[in-house]
Amino acid sequence: MQYFKVVIMKKNQIILVIIMLTLIVGIAAYSLWSFSKKAAIPVREGWTLSWHDEFDTKKIDSEIWTFDLGAGGWGNGEAEYYTNRPENARIEKGMLVIEARQEKYEGSYYTSARLKTQDLQEVLYGRVEARIKVPSGLGLWPAFWMLGSDFDGTNWPDCGEIDIMEHIGKEPDLILGTLHGPGYSGALGKSQWNRQNYNIADEFHTYAIEWEADQIRWYYDDIEYFKVNRTDLNDNKWVFDKPFFVILNLALGGTLPGPIGLDTEFPAQMYVDYVRVYQK
């Protein structure tokens, strides 16, 4: 009788072990499936993915991105010194982090980073999108934008500029989309303010343009809020029929956001989940 009790106990233990192993394997498989599902790039009907960066590498991909370096205001009276140091730009937990810091560096009192795809990955027509979490604070100026590939040999604004997203820290519920070109630049640029009823910096949002030969449309979380047609420029030249390169940066101070606030918290981070370019 005692023998049978021992056998039954051993069988129960074996069954319990099998159940536990099954649960462990199942959880591991589900986790792997969930990760793969999260990492999958959604298919956009009618579009083909041309190039992208999911920022899932250990370092910033030098085959996609290079850096603008230095200070001098960048034509806007900005206060930062742009570097390529990991303190200012790095990959962290599957995201690009652009970090603005309050520190004395090369004669400036602030540092940040400005990444670009110039001469590496350029775009002529298509959908250009990024999922970004912007920082908030007086004087912060995160942006996702593009310049014409002939920028180095052509005066601005003749090269053309497409501002997919600019966020001004002093107005946390607001983003701006703008088109700059010859005769319509700076304060005369073709632009649209897009105001929300919440702080945009609280969460990630998707910013995009869809660019065609005669029209550019702006999107915020897949909702169109602005468009410019070639015919809207009247006698001014449409310069958006050539390749452009992508720029991601976090500026400090300058003409648009105004002075940096005394209570603006540093370091301040701009997080970029991905950049994707689709074409038809």
Predicted features along the sequence, with ranges:
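Hydrophobic core
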Residues: 23-27
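GH16 jelly-roll
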Residues: 12, 16-19, 29-280
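Short, Lys/Arg-enriched N-terminal segments with co-localized hydrophobic residues
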Residues: 1-8
